[in-house]
């Protein structure tokens, strides 16, 4: 199979590598000054079809590659200058020089210049790169994600994540407005390329920097999708219906209605093929910011495992709406709502090998489970700006989660193939969580430039109620127990905080900031245990208890920063005073409750020549223990793993430093990023383990004296002109070292993880889009007491993706994966061959698309996970989706009539 993959790579390079011609020259103004960033386009003489393009570099030089013989039109444009057009005859192999081309200043407005907008693929103005969507030929029904794949300097991974200029894109705007903020893929997967006029890439400043005019160096790589004029007023969207073998189904709809003052969008999805309408980050964010409400419970979530397939078979439906409303020139509302229901069935088997100083043992676990979950999340933000000097904003985030789960599991424990014990566990759980987080912010800037004030108040309230019934039995050597229990777990969190920040300009580029913050938080869980084996449903008072964790924290800080065009420096010192109390009833449990810390910080951001940046950041921070780590109530929802809390935990004190170098060459669209992060923690909270009679695992959090974490990241992407392809390399190395305890014995744990990937793809994607790559994952864990445990996991995968337009309206696609999972402790390596295919045809002027989709044609898909803990190796198999074939149709709603496109430079 490796040879087949290598053959595919050869086909890729041979297919793309034909005779190649080049045109080069220089672009200057009448004074002979190089014009940097001028757009160069080569067109077919017969029909003005764009063949290739580029932009001039720092010296005004350009080189256009991948040209074939024939008569070509050379078109050069630059903002504020008249367009240059000339005819070039390409008749031999090699480079053709057009010499120095002088552009004259334009005497007309940009919109009056006689040019064809669809020929200008991109332009650069300031910090913004503008891509003209009309210049890139798209097949019918293409999404924005498909469009982004064609844009030089932008990379789209197989999971839909986006990099622009080598940096991760976390936010995608639509006409400058938030679109389901927090999930960039909702816009790129649900909006069609047909709707887009321009794609703009820029570094978005923080809201504070945009308002005050003082750069705080907190920038985020952002993409803005500018709609065509026809789609800025009216409704448009898409309906997609699919059904197939094995009773599979997948129905999607998205609809958008925009006007100058209102943007309304809705998306919906119903499917049973394990497809998420929202990203995993969205599902996590259903509870994000409210994590304390979940601590201590037994809620589980669907997770991604070793072969990239979700665990189990999931029937789900999801709905999302987004609203941007300009109520008045001074008042603006943004809101989005996400809702998801899932019904997940899982069949799971695992074999784990545990290594201890006394004896090693093997555990074989099986489980059947059904989990029904309903999630709701609502985010709103109301912004009022009465005048340019003041702004008020009120934001509120709310969530509701309902989870019903029933699990039937069994466990067998062996020592050297000798049976030690067997256990069974039937558990039924219902959990409900709800919460709200409100934030009120006032910002004011004064007449003196740079002087500003901000006040913030935050209120958070969450509630959680969980009820479980457990029927558990274990018998074997040293143990014989049965338990029929009902447990209730109720937790409340109340938190209030306030922040003050004042900035005073000391000189032109020097600013002094004073800040203060006060936080008060209380969490009060109650866990009750009842014995169901008695007729009276007797409460087990020796286990039941209430607990209170309270945290009061006061911070005061001072910082000074210096900003210039090329260099930004910031240094600060913060003092934190904490009062952390754990108590049962009126009895305080923790020996120490008062803590004080000095938290220094320093950062430097240096802009080097061209698009090169060098950043360094250091800061100290303190993290207080979570409720689940401190609560004394025993969590025995899984009686084979008893989870205890430690009320005497100290806060973590962390020194964190990071250094990064970024280089993006917008002239040849290559990028390079190198980053290294180092954490040194004192009192890092880690989980110690002890093995009780029956080899039941007891987990107790403790403070590690020292915890070291090092992470290095490298990303490089660049075109290979002669092969007409581009490549990208990603590599992440993580190393951790800390002290832990197993059965009360101190143990040094070292973990290392290396993830490396190489991807090759063709550059010109008009008719075909081909990509191939390899991913390697190496994980290793070592400890002091057992050298035999130091056995790494090596997983690697090869993949090939292809999409081809084979005729008018006809498209065919394929996706192939070759995956291996290896570890010396397991009997044999596992190999998977996964093959998907699609065939589609467009009708009715591309409004209707009919398609056939085949998943796992070789019927080899299996759920596999091989992982390692501090002293445990685990091999897991689980149910996942197998082979099916679907027939479907999609229909585009609200297609507007075509209009001439006007190119705009910059962003609004």
Q: How does the language model describe each region?
A:
Residues 19, 32, 61, 82, ...:
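Membrane-proximal, glycine/serine-rich, low-complexity loop/turn segments characteristic
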Residues 24-35:
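Structural motif
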Residues 43-49, 71-87:
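A short, solvent-exposed loop/turn motif at the edges and junctions
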Residues 45-61:
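Short, acidic Ser/Thr/Gly-rich low-complexity loop/linker segments typical of extracellular
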Residues 212-213, 277-283, 346-363, 405-419, ...:
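Outer-membrane beta-barrel translocator domains and adjoining extracellular loop/strand segments
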Residues 366, 495-497, 539-545, 644, ...:
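Outer membrane beta-barrel strand-and-loop segments of large Gram-negative receptors
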Residues 511-613, 785-790:
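Signature of Gram-negative outer-membrane beta-barrel scaffolds
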Residues 757-778, 790-908:
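Conserved C-terminal beta-signal and adjacent last beta-strands/turns
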């Amino acid at each position: 199979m490796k040879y087949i993959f290598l053959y595919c790579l050869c086909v890729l390079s041979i297919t793309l590598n034909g005779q190649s011609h080049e045109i080069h020259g220089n672009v200057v103004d009448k004074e002979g000054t190089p014009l940097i960033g001028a757009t160069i386009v080569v067109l077919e003489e017969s029909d003005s079809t764009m063949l290739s393009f580029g932009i001039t570099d720092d010296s005004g030089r350009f080189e256009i590659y991948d040209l074939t013989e024939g008569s070509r039109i050379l078109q050069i444009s630059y903002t504020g200058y008249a367009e240059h057009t000339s005819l070039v005859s390409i008749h031999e192999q090699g480079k053709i020089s057009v010499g120095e081309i002088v552009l004259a200043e334009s005497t007309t407005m940009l919109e009056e210049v006689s040019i064809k907008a669809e020929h200008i693929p991109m332009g650069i103005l300031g910090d913004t790169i503008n891509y003209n969507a009309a210049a890139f030929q798209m097949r019918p029904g293409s999404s924005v994600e498909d469009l982004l794949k064609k844009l030089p300097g932008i990379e789209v991974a197989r999971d839909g994540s986006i990099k622009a200029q080598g940096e991760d894109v976390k936010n995608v705007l639509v006409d400058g407005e938030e679109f389901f903020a927090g999930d960039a893929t909702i816009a790129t997967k649900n909006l069609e390329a047909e709707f887009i006029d321009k794609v703009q890439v820029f570094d978005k400043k923080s809201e504070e920097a945009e308002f005050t005019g003082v750069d705080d160096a907190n920038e985020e790589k952002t993409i803005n999708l500018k709609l065509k004029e026809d789609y800025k007023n009216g409704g448009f969207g898409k309906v997609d219906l699919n059904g197939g073998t094995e009773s599979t189904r997948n129905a999607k709809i998205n609809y958008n209605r925009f006007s100058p003052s209102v943007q309304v969008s809705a998306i919906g999805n119903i499917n049973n093929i394990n497809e998420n309408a929202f990203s995993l980050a969205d599902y996590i964010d259903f509870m994000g910011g409210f994590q304390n409400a979940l601590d201590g419970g037994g809620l589980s979530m669907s997770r991604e495992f070793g072969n990239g397939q979700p665990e189990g078979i999931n029937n789900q439906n999801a709905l999302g709406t987004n609203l941007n409303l300009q109520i008045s020139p001074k008042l603006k509302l943004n809101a989005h709502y996400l809702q998801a229901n899932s019904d997940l069935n899982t069949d799971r088997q695992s074999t784990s090998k545990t290594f201890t100083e006394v004896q090693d043992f093997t555990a074989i676990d099986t489980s059947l489970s059904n989990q029904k979950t309903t999630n709701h999340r609502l985010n709103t933000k109301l912004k009022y700006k009465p005048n340019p000097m003041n702004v008020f904003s009120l934001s509120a985030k709310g969530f509701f989660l309902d989870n019903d789960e029933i699990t039937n599991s069994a466990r067998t424990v062996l020592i050297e193939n000798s049976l030690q014990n067997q256990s069974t566990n039937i558990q039924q759980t219902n959990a409900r969580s709800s919460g709200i987080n409100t934030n009120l912010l006032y910002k004011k800037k004064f007449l003196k430039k740079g002087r500003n004030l901000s006040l913030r108040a935050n209120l958070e309230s969450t509630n959680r109620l969980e009820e479980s019934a457990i029927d558990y039995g274990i018998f074997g050597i040293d143990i014989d127990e049965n338990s029929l229990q009902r447990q209730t777990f109720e937790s409340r969190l109340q938190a209030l905080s306030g922040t003050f920040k004042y900035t005073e300009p000391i000189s032109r580029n020097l600013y002094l900031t004073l800040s203060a913050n006060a936080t008060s938080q209380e969490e009060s869980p109650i866990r009750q245990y009842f014995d169901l084996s008695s007729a009276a449903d007797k409460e087990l008072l020796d286990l039941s208890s209430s607990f209170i964790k309270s945290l009061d924290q006061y911070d005061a800080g001072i910082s000074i920063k210096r900003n210039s065009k090329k260099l930004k420096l910031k240094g600060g010192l913060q003092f934190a005073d904490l009062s952390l109390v754990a108590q049962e009833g009126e009895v305080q449990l923790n020996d120490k409750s008062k803590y004080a810390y000095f938290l220094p910080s320093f950062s430097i951001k240096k802009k080097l020549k061209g698009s090169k940046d060098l950043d360094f950041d250091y800061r100290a921070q303190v993290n207080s223990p979570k409720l689940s780590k401190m609560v004394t109530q025993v969590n025995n929802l899984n009686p084979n793993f008893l989870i205890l809390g430690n009320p005497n935990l100290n806060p973590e004190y962390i020194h964190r430093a990071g250094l990064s170098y970024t280089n993006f060459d917008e002239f040849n669209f290559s990028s390079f990023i190198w980053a290294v992060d180092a954490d040194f923690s004192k009192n890092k909270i880690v989980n110690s383990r002890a093995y009780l009679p029956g080899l039941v695992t007891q987990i107790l959090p403790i403070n590690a004296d020292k915890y070291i974490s090092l992470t290095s990241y490298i990303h490089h992407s660049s075109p290979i002109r002669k092969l007409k392809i581009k490549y990208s390399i990603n590599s992440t190395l993580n190393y951790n070292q800390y002290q832990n305890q197993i059965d009360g014995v101190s143990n040094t744990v070292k973990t290392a993880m290396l993830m490396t990937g190489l991807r090759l793809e063709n550059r010109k994607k008009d008719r075909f889009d081909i990509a191939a790559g390899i991913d390697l994952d190496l994980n290793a864990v070592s400890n002091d007491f057992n050298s035999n445990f130091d056995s790494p996991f090596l997983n690697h995968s090869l993949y090939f993706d292809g999409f081809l337009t084979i005729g008018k309206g006809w498209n065919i696609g394929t996706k192939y994966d070759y995956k291996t999972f290896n570890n010396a402790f397991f009997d044999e390596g596992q190999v998977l061959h996964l093959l998907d295919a699609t065939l589609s045809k467009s009708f009715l002027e591309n409004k209707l698309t009919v398609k056939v989709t085949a998943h796992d044609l070789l019927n080899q898909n299996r759920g596999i996970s091989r992982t390692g803990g501090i002293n445990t190796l685990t091999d897991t198999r689980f149910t996942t989706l197998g082979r099916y074939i679907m027939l479907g149709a999609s229909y585009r709603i609200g297609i507007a009539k075509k209009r001439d496109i006007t190119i705009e430079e910059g962003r609004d």
